[in-house]
Amino acid sequence: MNNIHKTAIIEEGAILGDNITIGAFTIIGKNVKIGDGTIIDSHTLIDGKTTIGKNNHIFSHASIGTIPQDLKFNGEDVELIIGDNNKIREYTLFNPGTIGGGSVTKIGSNNLFMGYVHVAHDCIIGDNCIFANGATLAGHVECDDFVVVGGLTPIHQFCKIGTQVMIGGASAVAQDIPPFCLAEGNKAVLRGLNLTGLRRRFDNREDIDAIKHAYRELFEVGKPLQDVARELLDNDKNKYVKELASFVLNTKRGIPFNRK
C-alpha cells in the first residue's frame, strides 16, 4: 500500500510500484516510473521520462528529470534511469540525456548523493559511489563503481573517472582519472593510489602490490606513458593491472600527473 500525502500531485500516466511514500507538495510527472519501496520526501519534483528503481530515498527539494541544461536541447525524447537503493539528498539536480550523447543519463545502485549535487545530461554513474555536498558533474561524465568525489568538486564534461577513484574536496577535474587512484587540486592531478579503498575492497595483498608496481611504472619513473601501458596490458597477468593499463591507453582527455 502506498502512502501519498494529500497535497502531492501525481499526474495521470505516472506508474507507481508498491509501498511507496510521497511527501507533501511533491510533484510526479506523467512519464515517471517509480519502483517498490521508494521514499520521496516533501517539495520534490520528478519529471520527464524518468525511471526510478526500488528502495531509493529522495529527500526534499530535489529536482529529478527536468530538461537538460544544454542550449541544443529541443524537446527530444530523452530519459533518466536511476537504479536501486540510492540516497539522493536535498537540492540535488539530475538531468536526462540529450540526442548528442545517447539520449540517456544512467545512474546505478547503492550510491549516496549528498546535498546540492548536480548530475548533468548524459552522465553514466556506476554503483556504490559517494558524491559529497556540492559535487558537480558536467555533461557526458562517466564514473565507474566505488568512486568518491569530495565536496565542491566540479568534473569537466566528457571526463571519465575509473573504479575506486577518490577525488579530494574543492578540486577541479579536467582530465580522466585512472582506476584506483587519488586525485586532488585545482587543477586536479594524481596524488598516488587510493590505498585505503583498495584495502577495504581487496582481500588479496598481491593484487594491491601489483597495482602499486603498475602505478610506479606508469607515473613515477619517467618512461613514455603509452609504451608502459601497452607493455603492462600485453604482459602483466593481473586483471586489475590490465584494467589500469587499458584505461590509460584509451583515455580521451589525458591523464593529469606530474611528469618526471
Curated annotation (Swiss-Prot):
Gene3D superfamilies, sorted: Hexapeptide repeat proteins, Udp N-acetylglucosamine O-acyltransferase, C-terminal domain
InterPro entries recorded: Acetyltransf_C (IPR029098), Acetyltransf_C_sf (IPR037157), Hexapep (IPR001451), Hexapep_transf_CS (IPR018357), Lipid_A_LpxA (IPR010137), Trimer_LpxA-like_sf (IPR011004)
GO BP terms in the entry: lipid A biosynthetic process
Keywords: Acyltransferase, Cytoplasm, Lipid A biosynthesis, Lipid biosynthesis, Lipid metabolism, Repeat, Transferase
Presence of the UniProt keyword Cytoplasm in the record: yes
Family: Belongs to the transferase hexapeptide repeat family. LpxA subfamily.
Name this protein carries in UniProt: Acyl-[acyl-carrier-protein]--UDP-N-acetylglucosamine O-acyltransferase
Compartment(s): Cytoplasm
GO molecular function, one term: acyl-[acyl-carrier-protein]-UDP-N-acetylglucosamine O-acyltransferase activity
EC number: 2.3.1.129
One GO cellular component term noted in the UniProt record for this chain: membrane
Pathway connected to this protein: Glycolipid biosynthesis; lipid IV(A) biosynthesis; lipid IV(A) from (3R)-3-hydroxytetradecanoyl-[acyl-carrier-protein] and UDP-N-acetyl-alpha-D-glucosamine: step 1/6
NCBIfam families in alphabetical order: lipid_A_lpxA, PRK05289.1
PANTHER family attached to this UniProt entry: ACYL-[ACYL-CARRIER-PROTEIN]--UDP-N-ACETYLGLUCOSAMINE O-ACYLTRANSFERASE, ACYL-[ACYL-CARRIER-PROTEIN]--UDP-N-ACETYLGLUCOSAMINE O-ACYLTRANSFERASE, MITOCHONDRIAL-RELATED
Catalytic activity, reaction form: a (3R)-hydroxyacyl-[ACP] + UDP-N-acetyl-alpha-D-glucosamine = a UDP-3-O-[(3R)-3-hydroxyacyl]-N-acetyl-alpha-D-glucosamine + holo-[ACP]
